[in-house]
Every structure is written in structure tokens, then in C-alpha cells.
């Protein structure tokens, strides 16, 4: 299908509004990244979304955009609240897949002799892989509380510190969640998966600070020096979130016969009971994901204490920030000079509110919302902060990762498992995985250049680079 694409600035591209499109499509990318997007259906999928009713301003594709289910991954779309479409495919199957960054008071020299032991201990405590269950087996009644209260349930039950909830987007809890909107099938899948990583591109990394770009902001977030040890957790709502998406997609597919450019964009009208139930179930799955990352944090803290034989106060392991990158949120944005309440979908995109935004607090309000962009296995990750330009360009959103460029099938054919492990060892990275496939599918070559994605994000003024981290150990499914 022919896409009319015009370049309107160094890193800004547009598919002009025409035909059935209700708004133009804006793509933020370098020449190199836009060429990658042309290789799959990213641009076609973004144009399809622009044809949906009630969409405002423009459909956005972030620099890490690539083909997904329905809308592209790296897609951001905002809709007026005048009975807009509620689109499960625009949140995706891994509801509140997100990342959490922890900082320590340690340098790599203090732990390098025990790094292998530490990785093994975390691997024991935090299961990874498809369908893997965790240490916690919840009754359905208890699981309902997790779904309704998110991170609050975890902290109230001793799995965290009081200050943890103040270092999480939305305080780790969406108040419109309702466990009754989540099917029993989804609950059965999720009841023993709290505190687990899962498979695919999910991981837990022990990292070190590689470079600090803004010392004042880094210090405010607890990042003080090069070679300081950090931990990055990347996971979501596991089988429960996947089932929520499947349940509602199936229901909407059967019940609503709207003329959509792609059946994967099936939706229910916001004012319908079905749409409201999906939003309640999505919020419940998001709460589950925040509780999941909280339980993993708890076990990481316990593992560090045991292996290093130090108390947690001297180790640190405070949360720098935790954010969602697959979610729908109700937010206020300025459209044509007027403030409007909108529903904003971010699918493979990170909220990036600027300094002073009313939804931020403490040091985040002063410096901007932290944006954590993980790289692929073996490559750097970045900490940035949201900037004012994000509100104008991308509904307060930023990139979320490197963005896949090779399918899992193709990635597996490039190297043998032993070759990948050897290459990573040569880079000084320990890898512990449940399966060989999990490593082969996630080789660095399967992803776009993280440095390029971050550079474009920074130069556009969407987010500002604060620090870069490099992995020393990776745990995968």
C-alpha cells in the first residue's frame, strides 16, 4: 500500500491527512530509523489508527516504532471523551508491561567477586520463563485485592517500603480497577505468577552506571557515580494481562461490527458497559503488573542481603522510578489552545511529563518524570526526564526501548546459543536463562540501535538524557 510520507523537520515526518484519515500521522525518527519502519507495516498501522473516530490532533509513532498487533508498537493516540472507541489492541496483550530501576550504594568492585552467587540467588527467588509460577500462591480472594489495590496490597502485606509507592507512576495503583471485570480464566493464570519475570523481551539486569550526562538530576534520583550498581526490572502483567486482552478482544469481535481498516483495531464505544468493563479489567491488570514488579523488588532486596551479608540500609536498592509502557490513561492535554480531558493510549511508549506537571510530585515535579529506556540484551539502557516539548509533540510521551527489527524466528537463526553466551561473556556480561530460545530470540542484533533512538528523543526535546547504564548480568526466561 502506497504511503505518502513527507519530511517536515530533521526528525519529524508526516503522513498528511487524506481519504478516511481523521488526523495526520506524525513520526519522530532519524533517516536511519524511518527506513527501518518502512520495512514492516509500522506506517500502514499508524495510518489505520488515524481513521478511527474521535482521535485528536495526530497519531504519533515514536523513534522505536515497529509493527505490532493493530496499532504499531511505539504508537501514541489520544481521543476525546465524547464516546471514543475503547481499543484493547491499542494497549496490547501485555498490559502495563513496564520497567523499574533500582539504585544501590554499591560500586561494581564491591560485588564483582559475588556477582555469580548473586545472579544465582536472584534466579532462584525470581522465576523466569513462559507460565512460570512464583513463590507466592494466592487465593482468588487475595488476588482480587491485588487487582483492586495494586502496589498498595504488596506494601500493606510487607513486600515493600512505605516510600516505594511514591516512586511509581500513578503511585502503582489505578483507582478505576475492578477485579469483577477480570475473568476467572485470567485469575487462574495469574494467581501464582506474582513475583515472576516471564519470557520474551522481559528480563532482570544488574547494571552499572556507565555515563552521567546531568549530574544535578542524576543526584536527585540517587545516581551519584560511574560504576555504581543498579538493577533494572522489565516485566508486566504476565498471563493474567494477556488473558484480559484476549477475553475482551474476543467479546468485541463477536459483538461490534464497526467498519475498521483492520480487524485488530476492533473497539467498543466508551459509553457501553463492555467498554467500561474492559477499562476496569485493564486497570486491574495494570495493578497486578505494579504488584508483580514490587514482589520482584522484594526478592531482589532479600537476595542482595543474603549474598552480600549486609543490611539493606547499607545496600540501598531504593526505587528510582517505575513506569508503564502499555496502558491507557485519562489525562488533560491542550488541543487547539483548549485544555481537554482525553483518553491517551500508549503502546510501547513511556509517559514523559515535563517539570511542573500537576500529576508529578517531589523531585519528579522539579526535574520532570523519569523515562527509563532499556536496551536489548547486552546493550546500554538510559535514564531520561520528560521535557515541555513532549506535551506539544507527543501527548507527553517518549520512546520505550530499542524497538525490534528482526522477528524472533529470524533472530534464532543468526547464532548458536554458545556463540551468544560467548559474545556476552567477552563483553563482561553473565547470562542466566530458563531456556536457550529465550536468549537466542533476544540477541542485540534483533533490535534497533538504542543509542540512535535515545539521541533522536533527546534532540527532539521530548526527553533529556540523564544517565546511561551497561549490563553486567542478565536474567531471562
Swiss-Prot record:
Pfam families: RtcB. SUPFAM superfamilies: Hypothetical protein PH1602 (SSF103365). Mn(2+) 1 binds at residues 94, 97, 202. Mn(2+) 2 binds at residues 97, 234, 325. Keywords: GTP-binding, Ligase, Manganese, Metal-binding, Nucleotide-binding, tRNA processing. Ligation proceeds through 3 nucleotidyl transfer steps, with 2',3'-cyclic phosphate termini being hydrolyzed to 3'-P termini in a step that precedes 3'-P activation with GMP. In the first nucleotidyl transfer step, RtcB reacts with GTP to form a covalent RtcB-histidine-GMP intermediate with release of PPi; in the second step, the GMP moiety is transferred to the RNA 3'-P; in the third step, the 5'-OH from the opposite RNA strand attacks the activated 3'-P to form a 3',5'-phosphodiester bond and release GMP. This is tRNA-splicing ligase RtcB. The gene is rtcB.
Amino acid at each position: 500500500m502506497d504511503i505518502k510520507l513527507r519530511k517536515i523537520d530533521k526528525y519529524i515526518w508526516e503522513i498528511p491527512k487524506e481519504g478516511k484519515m481523521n488526523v495526520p500521522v506524525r513520526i519522530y525518527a532519524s533517516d536511519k530509523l524511518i527506513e527501518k519502519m518502512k520495512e514492516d507495516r509500522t506506517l500502514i498501522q499508524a495510518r489505520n489508527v488515524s481513521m478511527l473516530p474521535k482521535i485528536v490532533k495526530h497519531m504519533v509513532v515514536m523513534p522505536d516504532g515497529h509493527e505490532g498487533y493493530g496499532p504499531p508498537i511505539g504508537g501514541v493516540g489520544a481521543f476525546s471523551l465524547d464516546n471514543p472507541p475503547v481499543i484493547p489492541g491499542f494497549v496490547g496483550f501485555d498490559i502495563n508491561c513496564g520497567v523499574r530501576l533500582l539504585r544501590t550504594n554499591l560500586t561494581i568492585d564491591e560485588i564483582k567477586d559475588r556477582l555469580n552467587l548473586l545472579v544465582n540467588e536472584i534466579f532462584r527467588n525470581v522465576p523466569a520463563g513462559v507460565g512460570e509460577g512464583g513463590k507466592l500462591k494466592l487465593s482468588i480472594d487475595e488476588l482480587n485485592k491485588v487487582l483492586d489495590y495494586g502496589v498498595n496490597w504488596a506494601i500493606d502485606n510487607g513486600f515493600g517500603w512505605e516510600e516505594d509507592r511514591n516512586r511509581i507512576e500513578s503511585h502503582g495503583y489505578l483507582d478505576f480497577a475492578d477485579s469483577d471485570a477480570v475473568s476467572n480464566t485470567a485469575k487462574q493464570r495469574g494467581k501464582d505468577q506474582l513475583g515472576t519475570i516471564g519470557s520474551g523481551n522481559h528480563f532482570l539486569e544488574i547494571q552499572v552506571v556507565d555515563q552521567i550526562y546531568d549530574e544535578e538530576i542524576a543526584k536527585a534520583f540517587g545516581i551519584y557515580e560511574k560504576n555504581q550498581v543498579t538493577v533494572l526490572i522489565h516485566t508486566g502483567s504476565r498471563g493474567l494481562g494477556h488473558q484480559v486482552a484476549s477475553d475482551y478482544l474476543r467479546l468485541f469481535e463477536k459483538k461490534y461490527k464497526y467498519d475498521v481498516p483492520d480487524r485488530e483495531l476492533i473497539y467498543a464505544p466508551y459509553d457501553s458497559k463492555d467498554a467500561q468493563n474492559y477499562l476496569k479489567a485493564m486497570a486491574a491488570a495494570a495493578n497486578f503488573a505494579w504488584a508483580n514488579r514490587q514482589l520482584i523488588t522484594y526478592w531482589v532486596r532479600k537476595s542482595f542481603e543474603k549474598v552480600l551479608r549486609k543490611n539493606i540500609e547499607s545496600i540501598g536498592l531504593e526505587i528510582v522510578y517505575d513506569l508503564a509502557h502499555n496502558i491507557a490513561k485519562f489525562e488533560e492535554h491542550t488541543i487547539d489552545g483548549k485544555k481537554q480531558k482525553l483518553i491517551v493510549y500508549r503502546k510501547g511508549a513511556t509517559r514523559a511529563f515535563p517539570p511542573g506537571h500537576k500529576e508529578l510530585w517531589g523531585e519528579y515535579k522539579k526535574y520532570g518524570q523519569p523515562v527509563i529506556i532499556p536496551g536489548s540484551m547486552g546493550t546500554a539502557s538510559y535514564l531520561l526526564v520528560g521535557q515541555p516539548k513532549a506535551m506539544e509533540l507527543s501527548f507527553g510521551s517518549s520512546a520505550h526501548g530499542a524497538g525490534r527489527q528482526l522477528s524472533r524466528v529470524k533472530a534464532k537463526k543468526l547464532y548458536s546459543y554458545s556463540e551468544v553466551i560467548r559474545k556476552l561473556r567477552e563483553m563482561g556480561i553473565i547470562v542466566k536463562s530458563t531456556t536457550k530460545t529465550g536468549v537466542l530470540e533476544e540477541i542485540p542484533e534483533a533490535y534497533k540501535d538504542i543509542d540512535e533512538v535515545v539521541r533522536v528523543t533527546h534532540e527532539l526535546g521530548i526527553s533529556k538524557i540523564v544517565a546511561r547504564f551497561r549490563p553486567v548480568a542478565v536474567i531471562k526466561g
